[in-house]
Amino acid sequence: MSGTTESQLNQLVGAMHLRHRFLGVFDKTFPGFLDPNRPASAIVNTGSRATGGMHWIAFAFDPIARKCYMFDPFGWSDRELWNLYKVKYDAFLRRTGLRQPDKCFELVRSVEAVQCPCSAACGLFSALFIASFDRYHTRPMDGNPIIDTVVGVKHSDMYKPEFQSILHRNQERMYFWFMKNNSFFRAHESELKRETAINSVPENH
């Protein structure tokens, strides 16, 4: 198989000993952030459990800043997410907003790719973002030593060989970060690298 499983991601994140509340790993029916006063995060799949899932995305909520972060390793737009995976997140974002005193919050989303389209490592990249949010909740998207392990590439460049080499290096740097900082990754290094390897996803996936 290619990619990380729900169980692997739960154990990987569990080994981080987070200071905020990690709600868990969900399929596309994720209910949202329903506690308006507590920082929280989740890893959400664009597919359903019944179909085995498709693509992992990380979400995090900062109640003080009233911001919800959406970290997609490919940085797809809403339209691209719908075209590729037939998924929308309007419902859970609406439920999150309804819990706010004035029913408002800011959605901050990634807009560049850090993962190569040939890679099955979206779950690992999502977990890296969870670690970034935990340590640097005011700037989890960039400008901190965890998320800056990887470099963003514009969508228009992500299929070009010279930029794919950057994305491939991102994956190697991410592996190195987990090796240094995560006991579950160290214990299952060979398996996780094999299942998320570069060139493990068919072209034009």
Curated annotation (Swiss-Prot):
This is Protease. The lineage of its organism: Viruses, Varidnaviria, Bamfordvirae, Preplasmiviricota, Tectiliviricetes. It catalyses: Cleaves proteins of the adenovirus and its host cell at two consensus sites: -Yaa-Xaa-Gly-Gly-|-Xaa- and -Yaa-Xaa-Gly-Xaa-|-Gly- (in which Yaa is Met, Ile or Leu, and Xaa is any amino acid). GO terms for biological process: proteolysis. All late proteins expressed from the major late promoter are produced by alternative splicing and alternative polyadenylation of the same gene giving rise to non-overlapping ORFs. A leader sequence is present in the N-terminus of all these mRNAs and is recognized by the viral shutoff protein to provide expression although conventional translation via ribosome scanning from the cap has been shut off in the host cell. The gene is L3. Requires DNA and protease cofactor for maximal activation. Inside nascent virions, becomes partially activated by binding to the viral DNA, allowing it to cleave the cofactor that binds to the protease and fully activates it. Actin, like the viral protease cofactor, seems to act as a cofactor in the cleavage of cytokeratin 18 and of actin itself. The active site is at H55, D72, C122. Its EC number is 3.4.22.39. Cleaves viral precursor proteins (pTP, pIIIa, pVI, pVII, pVIII, and pX) inside newly assembled particles giving rise to mature virions. Protease complexed to its cofactor slides along the viral DNA to specifically locate and cleave the viral precursors. Mature virions have a weakened organization compared to the unmature virions, thereby facilitating subsequent uncoating. Without maturation, the particle lacks infectivity and is unable to uncoat. Late in adenovirus infection, in the cytoplasm, may participate in the cytoskeleton destruction. Cleaves host cell cytoskeletal keratins K7 and K18. It comes from Avian adenovirus 8 (strain ATCC A-2A) (FAdV-8). Belongs to the peptidase C5 family. Keywords: Autocatalytic cleavage, Disulfide bond, DNA-binding, Host nucleus, Hydrolase, Late protein, Protease, Thiol protease, Virion. Interacts with protease cofactor pVI-C; this interaction is necessary for protease activation. The keyword Transmembrane does not apply. One of its GO terms (cellular component) is virion component. HAMAP family: ADV_PRO (MF_04059).
